[in-house]
Design a protein with these regions (language model features):
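Core structural elements
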Residues: 11, 59-60, 68, 308-325
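A glycine-rich phosphate-binding loop feature that marks nucleotide/adenosyl-phosphate handling sites
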Residues: 256-265, 313-317, 334-342, 357-365
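Non-catalytic, polymerase-adjacent accessory regions of viral genome-replication enzymes
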Residues: 1-38
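Conserved polymerase palm-domain catalytic core
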Residues: 42, 49-64, 68, 100-264
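Extended C-terminal regions of large enzymes
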Residues: 353-424
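A conserved non-catalytic segment of reverse transcriptases
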Residues: 171, 247-319
């Protein structure tokens, strides 16, 4: 098994994946663009070290990133060399586990995604299972029990050297401010092996849910169970919580785990509402608030960037966000987001013109008559009032922003939903 993992063809495939994913370097400072040259010159030595059990992974670099819902998420960034080896292990092991994983598990798996999880949840609701148990595992990636995980791996992996290498990666120290702290638990996010290991751990939960006959969807550590009554939901919630904490040795966040009605539930940034007797998918309010905050940051009046640069940034954000939420019924949401952003862009443009003379010249160029251009260019009204004025709304209208490169949320959403309709 280890020989196949360290085979040149497998390592070449892993190398391409690591280089493609880019990312910052680890504690040794080596970058992804240096990795191919390193492997060319050190392949035989590296292979021998690992085969003889003499290889020792470097500590991971601790990084804290803000979570979308508040707080921080801890990442452990391995060196690019360790990233290469972890990727080689993961891509060799993944097909072996795929045939055993649950059909209701959608995260970090080939040909599976968040949309499929949400659409499956919609089917459960439509079938009458309208009580939702939203499970929240407290600091899951940081608290995975190593012994239980290794016990699970033992069932699939017979090669003791491969098992030892994986354990070394689990136990690799974490460097923070120059100090290395040893790890006794967890499989921190940031490494190529972590997603597969997390699914192996939670596959036990999947099997237990299936054994009990529950309807559920799981995406990584985000799991929702669908039942028909509140009484059943409370019973299931208590039973599964006990199983997770006693059998899997994981902690359920009691404050965030809840039983809710679909309209009050959230799944991967989506929620649901009932329309004409059918459960429809919508964008969760928190997701809308987060994108508003992100766009607000980009369109700050005085952040040192031109309106053109802001539009370029917005375009990337809009395309990614709409592509993710395209399965939701969200026409009015997209229109309202555009309305708010165009107002902020008008403020940016008015600020960019700065002086009355420049404002007057630009208003005239955009078709505003001379008297109105003179009146508004000398106005002492605040930016917000100017941005909402009929004059500026007329001068800097939707067509103007389209010419500047801002197509907007609604236009991209319309194009994507139209494309989906034509495909199906």
């Amino acid at each position: 098994m280890l020989e196949e993992i360290l085979d040149r063809r497998n390592l070449e495939k892993a190398l391409k994946a690591v280089i493609s994913n880019k990312g910052s370097g680890g504690v040794d400072g080596m970058q992804t663009d240096e990795l191919r040259d390193y492997l060319t010159h050190h392949y035989q030595v590296l292979k021998q070290e690992i085969s003889e059990g003499n290889y020792r992974p470097s500590p991971v670099r601790k990084v804290l990133i803000p979570k979308a819902q508040g707080g921080t998420r801890m990442l452990g960034i391995p060196t690019v060399k360790d990233r290469l080896l972890q990727q080689a292990i993961a891509q060799w092991l993944s097909p072996k586990y795929e045939e055993h994983f649950s059909k209701n598990s959608y995260g970090f798996r080939p040909n599976r995604n968040a949309h499929q999880a949400v659409l499956q949840a919609q089917q459960y609701l439509q079938s009458g299972k309208t009580k939702v148990i939203e499970l929240d595992l407290e600091k899951f990636f940081d608290t995975v029990n190593h012994d239980r995980l290794m016990h699970s791996l033992n069932k699939m992996i017979s090669d003791s050297r491969t098992l030892q290498l994986i354990r070394l990666y689990l136990r690799a120290g974490m460097m923070e401010e120059g100090m290395v702290n040893q790890r006794q638990e967890g499989t921190p996010q940031g490494s190529p092996l972590s997603p597969l290991l997390s699914n192996i751990v939670l596959d036990e939960l999947d099997k237990e849910l299936e054994k009990r006959g529950h309807s559920y969807v799981r995406y990584a550590d985000d799991c929702s169970i669908y039942v028909s009554s509140k009484k059943a939901a409370n019973r299931v919630c208590a039973g599964i919580t006990e199983y997770i904490e006693t059998k899997l040795k994981l902690k359920v966040n009691a404050a965030k785990t809840k039983v809710s009605y679909p309209t009050g539930s959230t799944l991967l940034g989506f929620s649901f509402y009932k329309y004409k007797g059918k459960w429809e998918i919508r964008i969760a309010e928190k997701s809308i608030e987060r994108i508003k905050a992100k766009c607000k940051l980009i369109t700050q009046r005085s952040n040192g960037k031109s309106t053109k640069e802001k539009i370029s940034q917005l375009k990337q954000v809009v395309v990614g966000w709409v592509n993710y939420f395209v399965i939701a019924r969200a026409k009015s949401v997209m229109e309202k987001l555009d309305e708010g952003i165009r107002t902020r862009l008008r403020i940016c443009k008015w600020n960019e013109w700065k002086r009355p003379k420049a404002r007057r010249r630009n208003l005239l160029r955009l078709g505003i008559n001379k008297s109105k251009a003179y009146q508004w260019s000398n106005s002492s009204k605040g930016f917000c009032r100017i941005a909402h004025s009929p004059i500026l709304c007329s001068a800097l209208n939707n067509a103007y922003w389209s010419m500047q490169g801002y197509q907007g949320f609604y236009q991209h959403y319309h194009n994507r939903t139209k494309l989906q309709t034509s495909l199906f």
